[in-house]
Each structure stands twice: as C-alpha cells, then as structure tokens.
C-alpha cells in the first residue's frame, strides 16, 4: 500500500535569508550568506568565514534560561517549522489529538548543533 505525501508549506532559516521568501529571493539573485564570522573572534583560526544566520532572535521562542540549555539549532528549527505550518495555512488549534498522526514536519540542517557539542566537550578537553 502506498500513501501520497504532499508538501503544502515551506519554512527557511538560512545565512542568506530568514524566511522562505527572503531565502528564495536572495538565492535567485546570487546573494551569498557567507561572511566573516561575527559570533566570536575568529582571528586565531585559519578559516574566518562562515554562513551564520544573522538577525534571528531565539528569545521569541524560548526563555533565556531554556536557551542556555539548547543548541541554537532548536529555535531555528522551531521557527522554520512554524513558518512552514503558516505557509500551509495549518491552524494547529483546529486539530484534534488524533489528527496529529496525519501531520508531519520535516526539518533539515547542515551542521547545526556542532557548536553545542563543542560547548559541552571543550571543558573536558581543557581539563585533560
């Protein structure tokens, strides 16, 4: 038995655009999100450029205390998922609990979470 999968909404959080419309416009116009790293001082690194997402406020999704425990990827994924649901005109308040089994959001990331891993292992490495 095969079942159809239908993509009805999109969301994007990317170095070259926050939101699917900004992302698509910048992509079509050849706008790159690669810049000199600004989230920390990269002067001691051989590579000082990266694709950082600029202008995103994770406190719109989580409290400051929660943000200290989460990877930056989590609020980005939530924001993209919310945009995809909005783009699909899906109002979650109109769903019964049983309806959620027929709804899915697929999230993809490229290397997100590696900063959190470094944050967790760095103190251990320095103590050795």
Please place each PLM-identified region on the residue numbering.
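ACP-dependent fatty acid/polyketide chain-elongation machinery
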Residues: 1-66
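Structural signature of cysteine-dependent C-C bond-forming condensing enzymes
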Residues: 2, 88-104, 120
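Glycine/Thr-rich phosphate-binding loops of Rossmann-like dinucleotide-binding domains
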Residues: 15, 115-116
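Active-site nucleophile and cofactor-binding loops and adjacent substrate-binding regions
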Residues: 69-74, 98
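Stable alpha-helical structural segments in soluble proteins, enriched in small hydrophobic residues
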Residues: 76-88
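A short acidic, glycine/proline-enriched capping/turn motif at secondary-structure boundaries
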Residues: 83-84, 105, 110-114
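Conserved small/polar residues in nucleotide/adenosyl-binding loops
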Residues: 118-124
């Amino acid at each position: 038995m095969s079942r159809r999968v239908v993509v009805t909404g999109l969301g994007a959080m990317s170095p070259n655009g926050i939101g699917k419309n900004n992302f698509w416009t910048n992509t079509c116009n050849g706008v790159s999100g690669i810049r000199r790293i600004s989230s920390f001082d990269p002067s001691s690194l051989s590579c000082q450029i990266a694709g950082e997402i600029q202008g995103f406020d994770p406190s719109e999704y989580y409290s400051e205390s929660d943000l200290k425990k989460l990877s930056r990827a989590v609020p980005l994924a939530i924001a993209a998922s919310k945009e995809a649901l909005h783009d699909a005109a899906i109002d979650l308040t109109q769903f019964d609990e049983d309806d959620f089994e027929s709804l899915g959001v697929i999230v993809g990331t490229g290397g997100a979470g590696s900063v959190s891993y470094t944050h967790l292992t760095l103190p251990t490495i320095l103590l050795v």
